[in-house]
Amino acid sequence: MPPKTRGAVRKPRKKDKKNIALGQAHIKSTFNNTIVTITDPAGAVIAWASSGEVGFKGSRKSTPFAAQLAAEQAAKRAQEHGVRKVDVFVKGPGSGRETAIRSLTAAGLEVGSIQDVTPSAHNGCRPPKRRRV
């Protein structure tokens, strides 16, 4: 049997720089993680970061400090594409909501508006039972 040959090694394509002044920052803060996504007004993703991607594992992903670092990293990547002003959409009940918004402004992005888009069930699925520790 002949030795296996590997295919051509693919180089990672460098993303082309978009020049977008106004964007949207979507902060999804759950009980376990915080994900910050910065998009253009149409909804195409420019940059994103999460608490796990920044380097936190396990229960430390749900801390406000992890959300702060994730928001700073997403803002830094978005500023490379020319984003200067964002409208913030916050979703979820997690602990990193406010700190993520604060760190977006601290990173140099101007926050235009803040909207809470947390979905609420109109008597839909049964919620998880209470924890007994």
UniProtKB/Swiss-Prot annotation:
<keyword id="KW-0689">Ribosomal protein</keyword>
<comment type="similarity">
    <text>Belongs to the universal ribosomal protein uS11 family.</text>
</comment>
<comment type="subunit">
    <text>Part of the 30S ribosomal subunit. Interacts with proteins S7 and S18. Binds to IF-3.</text>
</comment>
<dbReference type="InterPro" id="IPR018102">
    <property type="entry name" value="Ribosomal_uS11_CS"/>
</dbReference>
<dbReference type="Pfam" id="PF00411">
    <property type="entry name" value="Ribosomal_S11"/>
</dbReference>
<keyword id="KW-0694">RNA-binding</keyword>
<dbReference type="InterPro" id="IPR036967">
    <property type="entry name" value="Ribosomal_uS11_sf"/>
</dbReference>
<keyword id="KW-0699">rRNA-binding</keyword>
<dbReference type="GO" id="GO:0006412">
    <property type="term" value="P:translation"/>
</dbReference>
<keyword id="KW-0687">Ribonucleoprotein</keyword>
<dbReference type="GO" id="GO:0019843">
    <property type="term" value="F:rRNA binding"/>
</dbReference>
<dbReference type="InterPro" id="IPR001971">
    <property type="entry name" value="Ribosomal_uS11"/>
</dbReference>
<comment type="function">
    <text>Located on the platform of the 30S subunit, it bridges several disparate RNA helices of the 16S rRNA. Forms part of the Shine-Dalgarno cleft in the 70S ribosome.</text>
</comment>
<feature type="compositionally biased region" description="Basic residues">
    <location>
        <begin position="7"/>
        <end position="17"/>
    </location>
</feature>
<feature type="region of interest" description="Disordered">
    <location>
        <begin position="1"/>
        <end position="22"/>
    </location>
</feature>
<protein>
    <recommendedName>
        <fullName>Small ribosomal subunit protein uS11</fullName>
    </recommendedName>
</protein>
<dbReference type="InterPro" id="IPR019981">
    <property type="entry name" value="Ribosomal_uS11_bac-type"/>
</dbReference>
<dbReference type="GO" id="GO:0003735">
    <property type="term" value="F:structural constituent of ribosome"/>
</dbReference>
<dbReference type="GO" id="GO:1990904">
    <property type="term" value="C:ribonucleoprotein complex"/>
</dbReference>
<dbReference type="GO" id="GO:0005840">
    <property type="term" value="C:ribosome"/>
</dbReference>
